[in-house]
Regions:
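Short regulatory alpha-helical segment in sensory/regulatory domains of signaling proteins that mediates
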Residues: 70, 88, 116, 120-129, ...
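Extracellular/periplasmic juxtamembrane segments that couple receptor/chemosensory ectodomains to their
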Residues: 242-270, 309-352
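Extracytoplasmic/periplasmic ligand-binding sensor regions of membrane-associated signaling proteins
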Residues: 178-264
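GAF sensory/regulatory domain recognition
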Residues: 138-199, 292-296
Length: 352
C-alpha cells in the first residue's frame, strides 16, 4: 500500500505584493503630512514671513554697504592737512617773491614754483588715501567772468589701483594734467589724455571747480575751507579721458581770505563699482549711488537721480534715467518702478 501525501492547494493570488502594500501605506502617510504642512504654512502665514525676512536681509545688506561707502567718502574728503600744507607753501613763495597772486593763474610758467612745491604733497595724499586721483587747480579770479575754454594751471594725478602696494618710483601713477617740465622732473608717466593745463569748461554746479571756489569767492571766504566742500552730483569725464569718475573738492584759502584755487580727490567709477558688489544681493540685484532733493527718505514718493550703478554683467556705469520709487506699503520696503513691483532699500550717505 502506498502512502500518498496530501495534495496542498495553492493560495489564490491577491495581486498585491508585501512591498507594494508597504509603499502604498508610506505614500498615504506622506500625503497626509504634506496636507498638514500646507495647512500649517497657510495658518501661520509662512509665505509672507519669508518675504519679510528677505526684505529685512536686503535692508541690512544695503545699510552695511552704505556705512562702508560712507567711511570711504569721509576719508577721501578729509583734506585739512593737505590744504594747510599747500597754503603754507603758497604763503612762503609769495613772501619770497617767487609767485604773484595777480599772475598765478595766467600760465603754468607763472604758477610753476607752486606746482613744483605742491606735487610731493599731492603724491603723498594719493598714497595714504583710498582714492584714485588727486588734483590742484589754480585760479584767483571770479569764475563768473572767466571765459569758457580758458586754460588754468593744474596738477591732476591718478592711481588706477589705490589698494595695491605703491611703487617706489611712482611707476603706478600717471599725470592727467601737469606742466611738461614737472612731468620730466618727476619722471611720472602721462595718461593718454594728458595735457599741461586744465580747460575751464564753465560747467557750473556740475563741475568740481566752480561750486567750491565760487561759493568761497562770493562769500568772502568767511567760513573754513571744508565748509565749502563739494561732491559732484553727476559723474564726469576729463576731456579726452575714458575713465568715468566723481570728485570731492574744496577751495584753497590764504589766511587773509584770498581764494586762489581748489584741491580735490577723485573716485573712479571702476573703483566704486568694486565696492558695490551686486553679487551680495539676491535675484540679480543692483546697487545705485543716487542723489535726491527729497528731504525725508521715508516719504511716500522718492525722486532719485542715479550717479553710478553697479552691473552684474561686469561693467560699471552711470544711469541717466531718473528713478521714481513709490512706497507700496507702510509696513514693507516694496516700491513700484516702471509698473513692476520691486523690493528696494534706501540708505542715506551722510557726507557733510
Amino acid at each position: 500500500m502506498q502512502n500518498r501525501k496530501p495534495h496542498r492547494q495553492k493560495a489564490p493570488q491577491t495581486g498585491h505584493s508585501i512591498f507594494g502594500t508597504i509603499l502604498f501605506s508610506l505614500l498615504a502617510v506622506l500625503a497626509v503630512e504634506i496636507l498638514l504642512l500646507t495647512f500649517a504654512a497657510h495658518a501661520t502665514r509662512l509665505g509672507p514671513q519669508l518675504n519679510q525676512n528677505a526684505e529685512d536681509i536686503l535692508a541690512m545688506q544695503v545699510d552695511n554697504r552704505s556705512r562702508y561707502l560712507q567711511s570711504i567718502f569721509h576719508d577721501a574728503q578729509e583734506l585739512t592737512s593737505l590744504s594747510d600744507t599747500i597754503n603754507g607753501l603758497t604763503q612762503q613763495l609769495l613772501d619770497e617773491g617767487e609767485i604773484s597772486l595777480s599772475t598765478l593763474d595766467s600760465s603754468s610758467d607763472a604758477a610753476y614754483p607752486l606746482l613744483e612745491a605742491a606735487a610731493p604733497e599731492l603724491i603723498s595724499t594719493l598714497r595714504i588715501k583710498s582714492v584714485t586721483g588727486v588734483f590742484l587747480i589754480l585760479n584767483t579770479h571770479d569764475l563768473d567772468k572767466r571765459k569758457q575754454d580758458s586754460l588754468l594751471p593744474a596738477i591732476y594725478l591718478r592711481d588706477l589701483d589705490p589698494d595695491a602696494a605703491p611703487s617706489q618710483r611712482n611707476a603706478d601713477l600717471t599725470f592727467v594734467r601737469a606742466p611738461a617740465q614737472l612731468v620730466q622732473s618727476l619722471s611720472i608717466a602721462t595718461d593718454n589724455s594728458w595735457s599741461p593745463t586744465i580747460r575751464y569748461r564753465a560747467l557750473g554746479n556740475r563741475g568740481f571747480l566752480y561750486p567750491p571756489f565760487q561759493a568761497a569767492y562770493k562769500d568772502g571766504a568767511s567760513l573754513a575751507a571744508s565748509d565749502y566742500g563739494h561732491w559732484t552730483s553727476r559723474s564726469y569725464l576729463v576731456p579726452g579721458d575714458t575713465h568715468e569718475a566723481i570728485a570731492y573738492s574744496q577751495p584753497l584759502i590764504l589766511p587773509d581770505g584770498t581764494v586762489y584755487g581748489v584741491i580735490g580727490v577723485e573716485l573712479l567709477a571702476d573703483y566704486l563699482w568694486e565696492n558695490l558688489p551686486c553679487s551680495e544681493l539676491q535675484n540679480n540685484g543692483t546697487y545705485f549711488l543716487a542723489v535726491t532733493d527729497t528731504e525725508e527718505l521715508s516719504a511716500s514718493e522718492l525722486q532719485l537721480r542715479p550717479v553710478l550703478r553697479s552691473h552684474c554683467d561686469g561693467q560699471p556705469g552711470s544711469a541717466d534715467e531718473s528713478l521714481t520709487l513709490r512706497l507700496h506699503s507702510a509696513h514693507t520696503r516694496r516700491y513700484l518702478f516702471s509698473n513692476d513691483l520691486y523690493i528696494a532699500s534706501v540708505s542715506p550717505l551722510d557726507l557733510y
